[in-house]
């Protein structure tokens, strides 16, 4: 995968979709979208969406702004809005992708500029157990329909972003 024609790189809401997020955030398994595309997602960007991926098992390669990164079990991938990225996962890779709109990011990060700086950097880093637990909670809540779901998702999003910022800081 190469990014030689940066002007020709597609911008998506979610890969292959053009509509905006209909929910507080979006969360899906890595396999859900990747398996449909033979485990390879071509270079693209999300102009108003921040993505956090967590590889539970399997692996592959991530391309972030033209730099190649190996993916491994326990890998956290931070993809800020506007950054070009592509993935080639090994078949049957398991994990999650959480997608947060800029508006939610702004709401959560209103008074924490240092955290915003950490999250503004695309990177692959080892996930902490706390981050993995937060991502699992986001997935469970997103998949359910319990009372106060939107409120809980907002809170879990803030927690997840906090753990991502810590991982980015440790990885720096």
Model-derived regions, located:
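Generic protein-terminus/edge-of-domain signal
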Residues: 1-60, 67-69
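Short aromatic/basic micro-patch
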Residues: 46, 78, 99
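Conserved RecA-like P-loop NTPase ATPase core
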Residues: 52, 101, 138
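A cytosolic small-molecule/anion-sensing beta-strand core signal
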Residues: 56, 72-73, 91
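Short acidic-glycine-tyrosine-enriched beta hairpin
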Residues: 66-81
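Ligand-binding loop in jelly-roll beta-barrel domains
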Residues: 81-104
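A short alpha->loop->secondary-structure connector
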Residues: 92-95, 105-120
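Amphipathic alpha-helical segments enriched in hydrophobic/aromatic residues interleaved with Lys/Arg
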Residues: 114-171
């Amino acid at each position: 995968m190469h990014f030689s024609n940066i002007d020709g790189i597609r911008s998506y809401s979610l890969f292959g979709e053009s509509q905006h997020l209909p929910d507080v955030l979006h969360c899906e398994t890595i396999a859900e979208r990747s398996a449909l595309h033979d485990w390879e997602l071509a270079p693209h960007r999300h102009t108003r969406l921040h993505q956090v991926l967590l590889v539970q098992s399997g692996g592959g390669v991530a391309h972030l702004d033209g730099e190649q990164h190996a993916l491994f079990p326990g890998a956290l991938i931070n993809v800020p809005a506007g950054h070009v990225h592509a993935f080639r996962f090994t078949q049957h890779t398991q994990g999650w992708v959480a997608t947060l709109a800029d508006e939610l990011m702004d709401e959560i990060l209103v008074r924490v500029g240092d955290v915003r700086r950490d999250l503004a950097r695309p990177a692959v880093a080892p996930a902490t157990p706390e981050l993995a637990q937060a991502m699992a909670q986001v997935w469970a809540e997103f998949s359910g329909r319990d009372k106060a779901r939107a409120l809980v998702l907002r809170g879990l999003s803030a927690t997840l972003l906090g753990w991502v910022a810590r991982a980015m800081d440790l990885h720096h």
